Amino acid sequence: FTLNIPGPIKVFPLGEMTFEEGIRLIDSQLHAWKIPVLEKRTIRDFTGNEQFWSVKGDTLFIKEILCLLEDSLSFDIDVIRTDETKVSRTELGFPGRKCLLCSNDAFVCSRSRTHTVKELLDKACELMKDYFEEKQAKKLSSLSMQALLYEVSATPKPGLVDRNNTGAHKDMDIFTFEASAVSLNHYFEKFALCGMEKEHENGHEPFSRIFARLRSLGIQAEDAMMTATKGINTHKGLIFSLAILNCSLGYMYANHIPYSPDTLLSINRKLVADVLEDFKDITAETARTNGERLYALYGMK
């Protein structure tokens, strides 16, 4: 196993991350299918990292399960028989590898030098970056959903919904909260990806623009929640809070900003810097929510 990295530079941080992820994914497949691993060996060199497995099993079956991995990233996974012949994708009915940049056969593009090395390397790096950003977004989404489920499951909570009763609420129970949490899982991921997006090539996008995109996603999330709960507001406040939190964490990840609570809070503030503009014309009479009314009467934020 190695990576298909175009150009002379084969080893760099993002490539190293992808190489280690490839090893993890292949190990996981071999373990899941109970394929005995007799020996493993890693070779690290400036010409490119390589990982070898000596396994016991049906080579055609092993190639089949690894072909699905091969198509997900810039993985180059060869399965070699004991007679030193290589199992090809076409033996299993899989099409040849496609070019990273177009739908043509990769071998044809390579032979005719259809694309420049820079174009191919940029695309390979983009695929690797997108993979890890999506993985991080899914992790943040999972943690957000866990938080919602743990919160409603905490028992007892006098006056609030918990596992044993509905507290002061007559229109919702723990199942309402669970349905709401499930409906929001996909949006928590989108909130994180929103912070990772870069509308400008140099990456310096105003936080106000990011927040505008985030707000649109938040409205969609509220609609999904209301559909799941049949019109009951279970998590509207948490949608707002977790949208900001996940977006900020996504922004930090994509921009390689080391995590600290103070840094996270600073980015949160920058994201919502203009949100008070929404309240400048609100009065106690025109307020639509308790929060707006408290702001109009007492300036509570």
What are these regions (language model features)?
Residues F1-P8, S28, P36-V37, R44-T47, ...:
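Anaerobic metallocofactor- and corrinoid-dependent redox/one-carbon enzyme cores
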Residues Q51-L68, R293-K301:
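A contiguous pocket-lining binding segment that forms or flanks enzyme active sites
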Residues F75-V79, V87-F94, M226-Y253, P258-I267, ...:
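Catalytic cofactor-binding cores of redox enzymes
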Residues E126, D130-H204, F211, L249-K301:
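Phosphate-rich cofactor/ligand-interacting catalytic cores and adjacent structured alpha/beta frameworks
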Residues K190-Y251:
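Long, hydrophobic/aromatic-enriched structural stretches that serve as scaffold segments
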